[in-house]
């Protein structure tokens, strides 16, 4: 059994660690609140832009654009959003497992995959995974802007336009609530078909200068907005997962200290009992 001094030292070490995890929990909770506000702000814009593009596309069915064309799938591309830091539970690993299963299904059909990564964890994973990383960006921080993602997004859009990839997907963790974050794979290109309620829309619109020019400008903005939405969703998910992980670590540290304190008390009691026994034995001998 460890000595009382060793046990006390270990309790002190765990207590210091508990202070750190508790502070990290509070910081994550504060950051999560701000990230939730960004999610709530960006969701309506992304949803409305998708609706507008669907309506404009229906206004001119003769308009052709590479982003709207279905073609034989030989290569697929993924824009994968991850965190830059760890200590957020299984957030990244669950996301990577989901996209790995998706890639496996494509490979069984003879389709190869290429990647762009937003976040250092994704870059590291896919370099080890063996995939070709066309673009990567890390250090988006707690307040990402759409300017931060334009570079990697443009690389993947150019690859799609040039026929290097035939489908483009976005992978991120969707923020549901504090306790739940869903790994999500969304198709970006070709542009998914409009939803039924959009197709059933009966209003006619006049577009200036014309639907073609509007759609041309909106398509790139649409992809950028969807990727940015994924970034803010993932940021909120990261802080929620980190808050939960740090709370669990803080609670576990408390339980471990209680166990060690009990061991220390037993060891101290045994030492005192031994000393009393030795004193009594010495008195009897005298």
Swiss-Prot record:
Protein's GO biological process: proton motive force-driven plasma membrane ATP synthesis
InterPro entries: ATP_synth_F1_ATPase_gsu, ATP_synth_F1_gsu
Subcellular localization, as worded in the UniProt entry: Cell inner membrane
Annotated TM spans: none
Entry's Gene Ontology molecular function annotations: ATP binding; proton-transporting ATP synthase activity, rotational mechanism
Cited SUPFAM superfamilies: ATP synthase (F1-ATPase), gamma subunit
The UniProt record lists the keyword Cell inner membrane: yes
Cell membrane is among the record's keywords: yes
GO CC, alphabetical: plasma membrane; proton-transporting ATP synthase complex
Domain of life, per lineage: Bacteria
CDD domains hit by this protein: F1-ATPase_gamma
Membrane topology per record: Peripheral membrane protein
Family per similarity comment: Belongs to the ATPase gamma chain family.
Subunit and partners: F-type ATPases have 2 components, CF(1) - the catalytic core - and CF(0) - the membrane proton channel. CF(1) has five subunits: alpha(3), beta(3), gamma(1), delta(1), epsilon(1). CF(0) has three main subunits: a, b and c.
Name the UniProt record assigns to this protein: ATP synthase gamma chain
Organism of provenance: Pseudoalteromonas translucida (strain TAC 125)
């Amino acid at each position: 059994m460890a000595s009382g001094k060793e046990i006390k030292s270990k309790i002190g070490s765990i207590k210091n660690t508990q202070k750190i995890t508790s502070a990290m929990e509070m910081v994550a909770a504060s950051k999560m609140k701000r990230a939730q506000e960004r999610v709530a702000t960006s969701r309506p814009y992304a949803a409305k832009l998708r609706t507008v593009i669907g309506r404009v596309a229906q206004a001119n069915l003769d308009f052709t654009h590479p982003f709207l064309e279905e073609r034989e799938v030989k290569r697929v591309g993924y824009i994968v959003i991850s965190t830059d830091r760890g200590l957020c539970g299984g957030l990244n690993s669950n996301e990577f497992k989901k996209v790995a299963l998706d890639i496996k299904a494509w490979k069984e059909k003879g389709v190869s995959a290429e990647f762009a990564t937003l976040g250092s964890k994704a870059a590291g994973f896919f370099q080890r995974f063996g995939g070709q990383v066309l673009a990567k960006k890390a250090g988006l921080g707690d307040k990402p802007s759409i300017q931060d993602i334009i570079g990697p997004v443009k690389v993947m859009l150019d690859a799609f336009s040039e026929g290097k990839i035939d489908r483009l997907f976005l992978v991120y963790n969707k923020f549901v609530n504090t306790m739940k974050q869903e790994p999500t794979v969304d198709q970006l290109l070709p542009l998914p078909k409009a939803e039924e309620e959009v197709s059933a829309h009966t209003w006619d619109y006049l577009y200036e200068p014309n639907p073609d020019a509007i759609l041309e400008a909106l398509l790139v903005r649409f992809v950028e907005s969807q990727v940015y939405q994924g970034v803010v969703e993932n940021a909120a998910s990261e802080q929620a997962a980190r808050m939960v992980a740090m709370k669990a670590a803080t609670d576990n540290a408390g339980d471990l200290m209680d166990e060690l304190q009990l061991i220390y008390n037993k060891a101290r009691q045994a030492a005192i009992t031994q000393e009393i026994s030795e004193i009594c034995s010495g008195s009897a001998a005298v």
